From Swiss-Prot:
Residues annotated for sn-glycerol 3-phosphate binding in this entry: 12, 82-83, 134, 241
Positions annotated to bind ADP: 12, 16, 263, 307, 408, 412
Annotated ATP binding sites: 12-14, 263, 307, 311, 408
Matching InterPro entries: ATPase_NBD, Carb_kinase_FGGY, Carb_kinase_FGGY_CS, FGGY_C, FGGY_N, Glycerol_kin
Gene Ontology biological process: glycerol catabolic process; glycerol metabolic process; glycerol-3-phosphate metabolic process
Protein name from the UniProt record: Glycerol kinase
Transmembrane spans: none
Lineage summary: Bacteria, Pseudomonadati, Acidobacteriota, Terriglobia, Bryobacterales
Organism: Solibacter usitatus (strain Ellin6076)
Amino acid sequence: MSNYIGAIDQGTTSTRFIVFDHGGRIVSVAQKEHEQIFPQPGWVEHDANEIWRRTREVIAEALEKRALSASDLAAIGITNQRETTVVWDRLSGEPVYNALVWQDTRTAAAVAELARDGGADRFRAQTGLPLATYFSALKIGWILDNVPAVRARAEAGDILFGNIDTFLLWNLTGGLHLTDCTNASRTHLMNLQTLDWDDELLAAFRIPRAMLPRIVSSSEVYGNATLASVAGVPIAGILGDQQAALVGQTCFHAGEAKNTYGTGCFLLMNTGTKPTPSKHGMLTTVAYRFATQPAVYALEGSVAITGALVQWVRDNFGLIEKSSDIEVLARTVKDNGGVYFVPAFSGLYAPYWKDNARGVIAGLTRYTNKGHLARAVLEATAFQTREVVEAMEKDSAIALETLRTDGGMVSNDLLMQFQSDILDRPVVRPAVQETTALGAAYAAGLAVGFFQDTDDLRSRWSVDHTWKPQMEPERRQELYSFWKKAVTRSFDWL
């Protein structure tokens, strides 16, 4: 049996290929960035061909580093930036336009138009999602309506759509047109109950069914690679990036949750085999589906600005020289000195969804110094995470016992301790922190017998560090009450 599993981790700014062993340990990794294209304010594009080129390069580089070949890989999994939309020619494989990235907001007018009849939650019952520029359906529509002749060609079956997972699979396998249910659940076109494209949604968004990939599970052998460097290796797992992190953290039981701390935060909670509708600002989404087993669902809460706030005080404020300095500066004081920083630079995401909120620093006095500001910056991430956890608990009627964490900010011990304190829950950092790629590797490995089952995966997952609450309940409530007061000051600024 081959000794390793490969994972393609295609993100918003870069592409990586990581090789894992049976223990889930990293054997080799290669990474390359790709260009961010900004044709107009609010428009964000990627060159899909460049992403495919970078994917080929990192696969070859990671294998070469350890003198590995295709025969050393039992399977390859794919994880990807979700919602980003590629439309290409069925015969040539050439994209008809750049990929429209999940951050792209050019479809805002179309969102408003659709929301006139039924509001932002018009399709939430079928999809678990509010109307937003975020999701794929309106991005597909924009390409169909703005690139000459593409709509007619799509209706004739000559044009294909896929998110990045589908485009990579198409190229890796010589033409397989598939997507998994986690990615499909972010298009605004899949029905959460049937796990299939919904005719009512296709009609509302004016998307031809002929251009859509077939929806499959997150863990099965889709086909074998035809790319020379990995020829013959089964492609056997696909998960959207945040769902992949949930799998990588082995959150396989209802009520288990992970939070990814990056530029923003993405918190997903496993809610079991039935979709849980949200009345508290969460998204309902597919967590994963392994082979023929029932789909498992999740609630998702996203926070727009967390790590980006540290970057902002570094670059715009000059408070620190490098991002890691924020913890050192924050440790120069024993608390936040009554200062609260609400980073609503472009509004607030979950659970508020207020586009007209703007950033606020509250509680300033002459006593305030740089250390207090640094504390307030870090604590903002923890406070926002608590708000999302509380909303999820209300929606799911499940109490979170432990929060598993990953992402760049989890190296900040001060933040992780404060997160545990303000949640009044243990916070855990895993030994392998590349959880997104690990989740894709787990999904692929399950499909080919490299891993036996989810119990096997849980036995391989291990803890690097656990933080436990140390704060008095009265102090916890006092801090959170002032945070809630500061948040209200950011509302309705515009």
